Regions:
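Histidine-centered metal-chelating micro-motifs
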Residues: 49-51, 69, 85, 89-95
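Conserved short histidine dyad/triad with adjacent acidic residue
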Residues: 25, 40-55, 89
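Short histidine-centered beta-strand/loop micro-motifs
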Residues: 30, 49-55, 96-98, 120
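Short, conserved beta-strand element in jelly-roll/cupin
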Residues: 43-45, 54-70, 110-112
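A short, N-terminal "cap"/entry segment at the start of jelly-roll beta-barrel domains
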Residues: 1-36, 120-121
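Glycine-centered loop/turn positions within well-structured domains
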Residues: 58, 77, 93
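Short acidic-glycine-tyrosine-enriched beta hairpin
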Residues: 75-89
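Ligand-binding loop in jelly-roll beta-barrel domains
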Residues: 33, 89-116
Length: 121
């Protein structure tokens, strides 16, 4: 169980060849008693992107601020604050910050526990 504020959770710089200019926070996870889902907040800087990948579990994405694209199985869709995506099992996907103003692309991403990459806990 948890009741908290996102500002009190550590922002982790995700270092990988698959990511560029991405930071994340784990908001809800098994560490606070969630045994089914993990909720993460990602911040993607200008020119940054998440990994271009697929996996055997669904993703739920909600964009909080910024501009970018979500690519789903090779098709790009524009995203902005209020945009959301359901990414089914096996769908190749990537989020990219396309802004030229320096604004962050911030989004919430919810996955099953087995889909969490294990940072920031």
């Amino acid at each position: 169980m948890i009741a908290a504020n996102v500002k009190d959770i550590k922002l982790v710089d995700l270092q990988s060849d698959a990511y560029k200019n991405v930071k994340g926070k784990v908001l809800i996870s098994p560490a606070c008693g969630s045994d089914e889902m993990v909720l993460r907040l990602f911040e993607v800087g200008q020119g940054g992107y998440s990994a271009d990948h697929s996996h055997d579990f669904p993703h739920y994405v909600y964009v909080l601020e910024g501009d970018g694209t979500v690519e789903l199985d090779g098709k790009k869709y524009p995203v902005e604050a209020g945009s959301f995506s359901f990414i089914p099992n096996g769908t190749k996907h990537q989020l990219v910050n396309t802004t030229t103003t320096g604004k962050m692309l911030k989004f919430l991403c919810m996955v099953p526990v087995e889909g969490h990459i294990g940072f920031g806990e």
